């Protein structure tokens, strides 16, 4: 939710994909087949840095085979169990991306940059054939707006808890 990425892409996070110094996740395999790199906002980077990868470099290893990442099926099953127990609301993993897209827009991140952060295929001729810019600077600016928005929401929630 903090990065707007597909749950299964985050689940496959490996030390080889994470550049802690630059706070960038760089994937070579993605759903649309295109390489994809995103700047990670500070709130998410802090969480990633708090996770100790296993001996094979996976941040989220499979419980059955630690040489592999957790499967998307395991993640979906976990979500369903949590919903059935009333721990989380009835949402799907896709809802997380949809919510990110909506709230990032509310935070002031332009739609084109949200699309690029989420690695949505751009179908216009210019994007497909001519534009080779990686948009990292623009994605980083968008993620900075998003991080500021998230931190403000979390601070507001904390203040409400203190009052209650």
Predicted regions and their residues:
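Active-site/catalytic core of tyrosine-dependent DNA strand-transfer enzymes
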Residues: 39-89, 95, 100, 108, ...
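Catalytic-site neighborhood detector that most strongly recognizes the C-terminal catalytic loop/helix
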Residues: 27-33, 45, 66, 118-155
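Short, polar N-cap/turn motifs at the start of nucleic acid-interacting alpha helices
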Residues: 16-24, 88-90, 109-130, 152-161
């Amino acid at each position: 939710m903090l990065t707007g990425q597909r749950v299964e892409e985050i689940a496959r996070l490996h030390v080889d994909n994470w550049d802690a110094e630059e706070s960038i996740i760089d994937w070579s395999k993605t759903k649309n087949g295109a390489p994809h790199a995103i700047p990670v906002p500070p709130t998410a980077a802090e969480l990633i840095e708090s996770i100790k990868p296993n001996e094979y470099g996976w941040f989220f290893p499979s419980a059955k085979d630690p040489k592999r990442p957790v499967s998307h099926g395991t993640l979906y099953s976990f979500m369903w169990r949590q919903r059935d127990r009333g721990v989380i609301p009835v949402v799907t993993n896709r809802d997380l991306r949809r919510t990110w897209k909506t709230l990032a827009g509310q935070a002031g991140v332009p739609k084109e940059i949200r699309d690029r952060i989420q690695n949505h295929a751009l179908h216009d001729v210019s994007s497909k054939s001519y534009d080779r810019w990686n948009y990292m600077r623009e994605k980083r600016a968008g993620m900075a707006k998003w991080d500021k928005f998230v931190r403000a929401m979390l601070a507001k929630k904390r203040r409400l808890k203190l009052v209650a």
